[in-house]
Amino acid sequence: MFARYLPPSAEKFPAQFKEKDALITPWRILPISILYNTELLKADEAPKSLEDLLNPKWKGKISIPDPSRHTTTAKFFWNLEKLMGAQWREYVKGLAKQQPLLVESLAPVTPAIIKGEVQVGIAYIKFVKQYKGPVSYVSLNKYLSDPNHLALGAKAARPNAGRLYIEFAVSAEGQKMIAQDGEFVLAPGVFPPIQGAEKVTPNMIPMDNPSEDEAKSLSNEFRQIFFAKDLGLPLDLEGAVET
């Protein structure tokens, strides 16, 4: 499906984001944090960690994507094992008890925060730059992050043009252009115009992708955790609800 190609400019990218087979090349990475409304909360009033979101004072004041439908959020919760170990499931259950405003993806979380529908939410840090309004992010010790990749088709009609495009996207010039829009990139020393971005990059942890079967299982599990009570179903009933 893909042809092996390692663009020269990507050789200096952090090792943890490189693919060993060189079939795909990372061009940006999307760190996730807690975003908050700066008009409703001062910086010292915002949650200090993901665990802080379980404080009763945030009940009904949080927005997250519906993890039973949004695959990136399901992946984020699943990868919390990297930060919380086996307790990650209990964390997700605790978050569900906070009665969060569930939206369809990460993008609508930020407008909900800006409009004051909620005070805090889980979303990409880049939205602080990409949405206009009173919103900032919480500095965490580690950031689960979603790498995005470019690849050269094995049967590309114009493979040289494809190589040139990929090389430009990961070159210093290309990475600077991409970063100006709030994107976190992998070129050393290149950061988006977001306060504290240089402290985010060294603490990004790439998320693993669940298999297709694992993804289906996670969707069912999160549907039970977040909706089983509303549906009148026991929480230990596996795979009972399909949409």
What are these regions (language model features)?
Residues 165:
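Substrate/cofactor-recognition hotspot
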Residues 33-40, 147-161, 177-178:
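A bilobed periplasmic-binding-protein/Venus flytrap-type ligand-binding module shared by bacterial periplasmic
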Residues 32, 40-42, 60, 68-72, ...:
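Solvent-exposed loop/turn segments at secondary-structure junctions
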Residues 15-16, 30, 57-68, 92-96, 102-103, 169-191, ...:
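Periplasmic-binding protein-like
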Residues 212-243:
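Conserved C-terminal helix/tail region of periplasmic/extracytoplasmic solute-binding proteins
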Residues 1-117:
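Extracytoplasmic ligand-binding site segments that recognize negatively charged/polar headgroups
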Residues 114-137:
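A ligand-binding cleft/hinge motif common to bilobed small-molecule-binding domains
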